[in-house]
Regions:
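Ubiquitin system architectures
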Residues: 1-85
Length: 85
């Protein structure tokens, strides 16, 4: 399986979205894609990639720039939060 289903939460508004994401894309590219997708669901969420990072609840850490979900150890069903850098 080349994709994971993750819940992406906006830690500021409390909203959550389930998304299917590729596990082999670097976290910064994935974050940019997630922000673009969330703007379609919730236009009021106007986060810039320079302001936020992806934080994995189960792992208890931010994903590193250049790290893929697979390299980070993100599992299917994990919750990723948009967290302020």
């Amino acid at each position: 399986m080349n994709h994971l289903i993750v819940t992406v939460g906006d830690s500021f508004s409390g909203r959550k979205f389930d998304l299917e994401v590729p596990k082999d894309v670097e976290s910064e590219k994935l974050l940019d894609d997630i922000l673009e997708t969330l703007r379609g669901y919730a236009p009021e969420l106007q986060w810039r990639i320079s302001e936020v990072a992806l934080w994995d609840r189960r792992l208890g850490r931010m994903l590193k720039p250049g790290e893929t979900l697979e390299e980070a150890g993100v599992w299917n069903g994990d919750t990723l939060y948009l967290a302020q850098k």
